Curated annotation (Swiss-Prot):
The active site is at residue 188. PANTHER family: MALATE DEHYDROGENASE. Substrate binds at residues 93, 99, 132, 163. HAMAP family: Malate_dehydrog_2 (MF_01517). Belongs to the LDH/MDH superfamily. MDH type 2 family. It comes from the Bacteria. It catalyses: (S)-malate + NAD(+) = oxaloacetate + NADH + H(+). Keywords: NAD, Oxidoreductase, Tricarboxylic acid cycle. This is Malate dehydrogenase. Catalyzes the reversible oxidation of malate to oxaloacetate.
């Protein structure tokens, strides 16, 4: 007996990340190889023709799991009964644009989308914000959807997590799949703090294997934090395939579970680790039965506290910059 189809809403569907994402979702990479999906694609009126072109390609793949596609410029149509919502579309920063202008332009978008989710999405909708500034955009959407549980709103730090894993694997000479107990704290921005103090590789203590605090502070942390900029510099375009891959990892783990492995998600704070309530902040979680659970009780040393507070202060500044727009 085939499972009933899940409705997956994707915003910014005509964009680069969307193009890398949609075919993999339709192929079952995100929700499982036995889970039919209906894609509900949102983009701006001027992007509708481009989205329709992507839909033609989706049709031409004849994916067995693709049970339907909706294309719209209306958030209430895109989010109708959505089980998963990937909020990829956001206003990019243009030349000469101040960060505060970027914040308010995105606050407008994510207020509208939060309200639409509140009105029409499934009450169990799993929301992942990819569009930057992701943590604050997730906070805005959450605050605009008072009838949905706060825990349904998450921001993507999985790209940072995966970037950190790959750097650690290269440095330690261990397979990337063998590294466990990594966490990336804070904001999806260069202030994030990738922390491998308790991480292991093939069961061995990773700090002992690497044994290079100078590398950690002066190479590893800045490399992970500035990787996005390095890709733009090299390619002339921002990272799209790796961002789409991280979004799929994030949702797959949230829905299907992590088998006890730690992953990083940006989630609304419950006050633990000194993070004020509701701030969407990257922490280590494990997932099972469609729910995430933060890893509690990690020891925070002085260096870590400083790094965690630094990224928190940036998030508080962003929150204060949009607070007046949230009614």
């Amino acid at each position: 007996m085939a499972k009933p189809a899940k409705r997956v809403a994707v915003t910014g569907a005509a964009g680069q990340i969307g193009y890398s994402l949609l075919f993999r979702i339709a192929n079952g990479d995100m929700l499982g190889k036995d889970q039919p999906v209906i894609l509900q694609l949102l983009d701006l009126p001027q992007a509708q023709a481009a989205v329709k072109g992507v839909v033609m390609e989706l049709e031409d793949c004849a994916f067995p799991l693709l049970a339907g596609v909706v294309v719209t410029d209306d958030p209430k149509v895109a989010f109708k009964d959505a089980d998963v919502a990937l909020l990829v579309g956001a206003r990019p920063r243009s030349k000469g644009m101040e960060r505060k202008d970027l914040l308010s332009a995105n606050a407008e978008i994510f207020t509208v989308q939060g309200k639409a989710l509140n009105e029409v999405a499934s009450r169990d909708v799993k929301v992942l914000v990819v569009g930057n500034p992701a943590n604050t955009n997730a906070y805005i959407a959450m605050k605009s959807a008072p009838d949905l549980p706060k825990k349904n709103f998450t921001a993507m730090l999985r790209l940072d997590h995966n970037r950190a894993l790959s750097q650690l694997a290269a440095k330690s000479g261990k397979p990337v799949s063998s590294i466990e107990k990594l966490v990336v704290w804070g904001n999806h921005s260069p202030t994030m703090y990738p922390d491998f103090r308790v991480a292991t590789a093939e069961g061995q203590d990773l700090t002992k294997l690497i044994n290079d605090e100078e590398w950690n502070r002066n190479t590893f942390i800045p490399t992970v934090g500035k990787r996005g900029a390095a890709i733009i510099e090299a390619r002339g375009l921002s990272s799209a395939a790796s961002a789409a891959n991280a979004a799929i990892d994030h949702v797959r783990d949230w829905v299907l579970g992590t088998n006890g492995k730690w992953v990083t998600m940006g989630i609304p704070s419950d006050g633990s680790y000194g993070i004020p309530e509701d701030i969407v902040y990257g922490v280590a979680v494990t997932c099972e039965n469609g729910e995430y659970k933060r890893v509690e009780g990690l020891q925070i040393d002085a260096f870590s506290r400083e790094k965690m507070d630094n990224t928190l202060n940036e998030l508080l500044e962003e929150r204060d910059g949009v607070q007046h727009l949230l009614g």
